């Protein structure tokens, strides 16, 4: 489950170091042809030479991974009281936030709408941005 996010993240960062790739290539996209192409396209879209964000500090990064792991080990919260529409979006091959978690979340939210993008990982919304953006605009109207 999500409590393994630190292990997966560190492994993919190591793979990225060995291959000279951005860690997002491995973290957000499945390593199938469509995923690899989507990863390359995404990384080109977000490449900036100006107004770049500061890099995350190592201590902040480690605290974030620890917090996710702790949260993933907790008992599930009762979500039945949440009545507003909630859109749960994921890829069908998400290793960081395993896809079954999305189905579980959508089942426990009484007014949930679930979208699972095929052949996509954690970066499914980046991979399917041309579909996701119009759907998001419609959902939030």
Map each language-model feature to its residues.
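Conserved alpha/beta-hydrolase "acid-adjacent" motif
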Residues: 95-101
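Short beta-strand/loop motif that positions the catalytic acidic residue
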Residues: 82, 88-90, 94
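Active-site acidic short loop of glycosyltransferases
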Residues: 83-84, 111
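Soluble, non-transmembrane catalytic domains of enzymes that act on hydrophobic metabolites at membranes
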Residues: 62, 76, 93-95, 134-139
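Catalytic active-site module of serine/aspartate enzymes centered on a nucleophile-bearing elbow/loop
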Residues: 111-141
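Conserved alpha/beta-hydrolase catalytic His-Asp/Glu region
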Residues: 23-73, 78
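Flexible "cap/lid" loop of the alpha/beta hydrolase fold
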Residues: 1-19
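Active-site phosphate/pyrophosphate- and oxyanion-stabilizing loops and adjacent acidic/basic residues
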Residues: 103-104, 130
């Amino acid at each position: 489950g999500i409590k393994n996010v630190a292990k997966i993240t560190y492994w993919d960062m190591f793979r990225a170091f060995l291959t000279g790739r951005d860690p997002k290539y491995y973290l957000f996209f499945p390593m199938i042809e469509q995923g690899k192409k989507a990863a390359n396209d995404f990384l080109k879209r977000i490449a900036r030479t100006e107004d770049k964000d500061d890099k995350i500090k190592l201590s902040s990064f480690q605290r974030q991974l620890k917090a996710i792991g702790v949260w993933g080990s907790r008992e599930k919260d009762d979500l039945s009281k949440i009545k507003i529409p909630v859109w749960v979006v994921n890829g069908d091959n998400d290793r960081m936030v395993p896809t079954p978690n999305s189905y579980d979340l959508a089942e426990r939210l009484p007014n949930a709408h679930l979208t699972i993008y095929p052949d996509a990982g954690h970066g499914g919304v980046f991979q399917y941005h041309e579909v996701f953006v119009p759907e998001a605009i419609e959902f939030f109207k």
